Curated annotation (Swiss-Prot):
One of its GO terms (biological process) is guanine salvage. The gene is HPRT1. CDD domains: PRTases_typeI. Mg(2+) binds at residue 194. It is an enzyme of class 2 (transferase). It is found in: Cytoplasm. Keywords: Acetylation, Cytoplasm, Glycosyltransferase, Isopeptide bond, Magnesium, Metal-binding, Nucleotide-binding, Phosphoprotein, Purine salvage, Transferase, Ubl conjugation. The keyword Repeat does not apply. This is Hypoxanthine-guanine phosphoribosyltransferase. The modification N6-acetyllysine is found at residue 103. It comes from the Eukaryota. It comes from Sus scrofa. Homotetramer.
Length: 218
């Protein structure tokens, strides 16, 4: 049985932090309930994940595959930490990047209908160590679909890093190899996670309010 990937577990009754304790853009002041994961904590956890990735995958050229759009902030910060490790290590490895865009959400619900609406030719992944970087695993269906697409091209290794994994009864049971935080079944935004394209410009991961859902509903 595979070992469960470690993560920072945020409990169901976690109260979060008052918005007025942090710098929040004024245009979102009424649209959020609370700050759930402050930006500094995200960065510290991401730094450790970079070390874990290098320890497990650092023996061979890595292709880092970013799942757009929500994964781009985590992707950029994770790669910055990996590059820093590369610069300061006797054993550095080459790394290239690629991008794919998937869509499975309308409003705050994962539709289960996975659309690949961007990305380069995945045949370039053949024989490579592939690190897929995602913002959040909700039901897990999106990632299972992407993994099946990637594995058709016979990569040497495929690992998945996700900033967040949601505890939800809708989960198919999939868990990535590298996990930042395990969170309750709440719809979170910020740090590039969106609600119908809004809130990507927040630094912190926050819980959206009912007012925010109504205002930005598709």
């Amino acid at each position: 049985m595979a070992t469960r990937s470690p993560s920072v577990v945020i409990s169901d009754d976690e109260p979060g932090y008052d918005l007025d304790l942090f710098c929040i853009p004024n245009h979102y002041a009424e649209d959020l309930e609370k700050v759930f994961i402050p930006h500094g904590l995200i960065m510290d956890r991401t730094e450790r994940l970079a070390r874990d990735v290098m320890k497990e995958m650092g023996g061979h050229h890595i292709v880092a595959l970013c799942v757009l759009k929500g994964g781009y902030k985590f992707f950029a910060d994770l790669l910055d930490y990996i590059k820093a490790l590369n610069r300061n290590s006797d054993r550095s490895i080459p790394m290239t990047v690629d991008f794919i865009r998937l869509k499975s959400y309308c409003n705050d619900q994962s539709t289960g209908d996975i659309k690949v609406i961007g990305g380069d030719d995945l045949s370039t992944l053949t024989g490579k160590n592939v690190l897929i970087v995602e913002d959040i695993i909700d039901t897990g269906k999106t990632m299972q679909t992407l993994l099946s697409l990637v594995k058709q091209h016979n990569p040497k290794m495929v690992k998945v890093a996700s900033l967040l994994v949601k505890r939800t009864p809708r989960s198919v049971g999939y868990r990535p190899d590298f996990v930042g935080f395990e969170i309750p079944d709440k719809f979170v935004v910020g740090y590039a996670l969106d609600y119908n394209e809004y809130f990507r410009d927040l630094n912190h991961v926050c819980v959206i309010s009912e007012t925010g859902k109504a205002k930005y509903k598709a």
